[in-house]
Amino acid sequence: MTAVQDPTVQRRRLRVELRRARDAAGLRQADVAHAMDWSPSKLIRIERGDVSVSTNDLRALLNHYGVKDKGKVNRLLELARSARGSSFYDQYADLLKQGYKEYLAYEASASVIRQYDPILIPGLLQTEEYARGLFAGFGRADPENADRGWAVRQHRQEVHDREIPPEMRFVLDEAALRRHVGRGSAMRHQLERIKEYAAEPYISIRILPFTRGAHPGMDGNFILLEFADPNLDDLVHLESINSITVRDDTELIAKYLDRFVQLEELALTPEESIDFLDALISDVSLTDQPTNSAEKEAV
């Protein structure tokens, strides 16, 4: 399976190319907007990747920048066309937090994914039973929303089926592994799935046990996305109760990358983590777990 480029990512690629072309021409945004008879905000939105640009506007813009190479012009025109398409995640916009649709598009294009989570099993590692247990706990107990939520998870997890999957590095807090989510043997199946993923050459899973005490990740989860494409800046994903923030701030990314390295060093080694998982799997009860209290309220 090959990666499908989301329009959100294509807009981001195009914006980098256009900013480079303007810089190479030695032009300011205000001068370009005036010459094109555009409002300054239109060019700003295009260069930020907030909006698509028509092929006619793009041709005029490239001509103004002195870009004459036909191969480059055609490549950028094709990029603009693909940037105007629809995203798989558009149909789930009502289900996703603000900013999450954009994050998912970037995640699918990343070459390296680093994630720390103190509470939940990351979506890229979740089983269907675990995911549906989460939806119930979040108050999404109705079948339609649960089905749609799982469809989003499934689409994300298609990265595992690529010929060359991204490198994935996870640090999981013991709390996320011990919290029973779902019913019956759901949690045992989830732990077994994590163990299976840990055996994959492109995945590193380290467990941060309670015995490590206080640590740098206690103030929340985060995800770092690294891209092989020079036209895509690396990103950090931060989450609050109502929204998702995706930042390309170099200093902020360096701060969180340093934090992730600290957490990896503090966590168990991959081999020790497998032994830890084996012990947890043995401890998990095979009897039905009680229904989540949040699920009771939502039904």
Describe each model-derived feature in a short phrase.
Residues 164, 181-299:
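C-terminal regulatory/effector modules of DNA-binding transcriptional regulators
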Residues 2-16, 20, 30-34, 48, ...:
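Interdomain hinge/linker segments and adjacent boundary elements that couple functional modules
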Residues 26-44:
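Short alpha-helical DNA-recognition segment
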Residues 23:
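Short helix-to-coil "ATP-lid" hinge immediately C-terminal to the conserved N-box Asn in the Bergerat
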Residues 37, 55-59, 234-239:
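Short acidic (Asp/Glu) and glycine-rich catalytic loops that position anionic groups and cofactors
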Residues 38, 88-89, 222:
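Tryptophan-centered motif/residue detector
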